[in-house]
Amino acid sequence: MTKGQLSDTDRIEVVKYRLEKAHRTYKEAVGSIENGYVETAVNRLYYAAYYAVSALLISYKYEASTHNGVIQMFGKAFLRNGVIDKEYGKTFNQLFSLRLTGDYEDRHILDMTTEVLPLVKPAKELIDTVSEMAKERIYLE
């Protein structure tokens, strides 16, 4: 994780793009759920949250090159100090874990009802919360 590698103009553009991508990807997740595509739904839910969280980090001039870097910096910069409710961190970690399971585990079939659907609302709340924080941050500067 590094701090401040982007120019202010580039940072604002990247934040806007990632927030748009987060909301578009969330819609893809909902469509996948409606069509019964469990693994795709989990993948899209995770990536929607990932894009939103990474936008938040970038809005504060943090940049990560890995998924684990984003997860760790989110915890360090926003969860541990109570800026954001720790439940959002739990949601983000659950999404990451399920995404890995859906993408790479051959012996575990994800269940839409018990594993995916319970995360839809918390994922949306996470995305909306961090999106608003990122927007406020880039427009205040």
Language-model features, listed with the residues they occupy:
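Terminal alpha-helical segments
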Residues: 1-141
